[in-house]
Amino acid sequence: EALWESMGKDSTDLDDLIENVAIATVGDVMDLEDENRIFVKEGLQMLKRTKNPGLKALIECTGIDKESLNSYHIGFVLGPCINASGRLDTAKRALKLLRVRTQKEADILAGDLKALNDSRKDMTEEAVKLAKEQVETTDLSDDRVLVIYLPDCHESLAGIVAGRIRECYYKPVFVLTDAEDGAKGSGRSIDGYHMYEELNKCKDILTKFGGHRLAAGLSLEKENIAEFRRRLNENCTLTEEEMKEKVTIDMEMPFLCVTEELVKELELLEPFGKGNTKPIFAARGVTLLGARILGKNRNVLKIKAQDANGSVIEAM
């Protein structure tokens, strides 16, 4: 506020920036606690009626219903479109969208960013496919720490691919790609494996590295990739139990309690995100009564189940 006033501007105009604060907070995966949660909650309301031509165009071209816009749409729809320009081209394109004055130009720029993000998604899917093939058709499958070399993968996608592979196998993952000088890449970890500390043990064969417990970035000479993989696995102390993914539930709930009224009440806890995750409920003694695969892409599962109390529910 002081900075704004020192620029000779009215501090009340700061309210107009709350929608940008919401996008930045969710897009950068900040904890949705305390002031952050308030900023995002208010920013989402502003986004629904935004006057910014660029944001308005991006919301429309991605097919988001303004009235149902929430933190998910920032994190998984709008945010990736804005970030795609920096990943594959130049971040100036996203900045230009946010500063554009005319709706006509905004529509063109928003369409370009969406197309760029669609391209990014296709490239990511191809890289994930190649990474899985490496893991499942080579001796990588025996490793507790996966070091995957994808020479043709765009370096800005290495972290995304590493995260996807970690989800598949629940192992620490490093994805390396070709760089101008050697190889570089990103790592994504699991609980129980401090990625930065493990990299520190290999620092003599790394050109540079940085990170924290759950994620890291690094570069090294290509001829050191095999040695890097060997050392990481030799040093790894993860047990079989630590390599089993754990799901923490908030409470057990019988099917009888799952009502539209409950869903409405849970909406009061929004916005959801890091630091304020969606509650997870579970039921024990569930019997599956039937299941069907639906959808054009055969990627939707519909089930019918019965809990221990005899209540029957359908779910997608």
Stretches found by the model and what they are:
Residues Q103-G111, A115-Y149, K201-M316:
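Mid-to-C-terminal polyanion-binding domains and interfaces
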Residues E5-E223, L294:
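Hydrophobic helix-and-loop "lid/oligomerization" segment in the mid-to-C-terminal part
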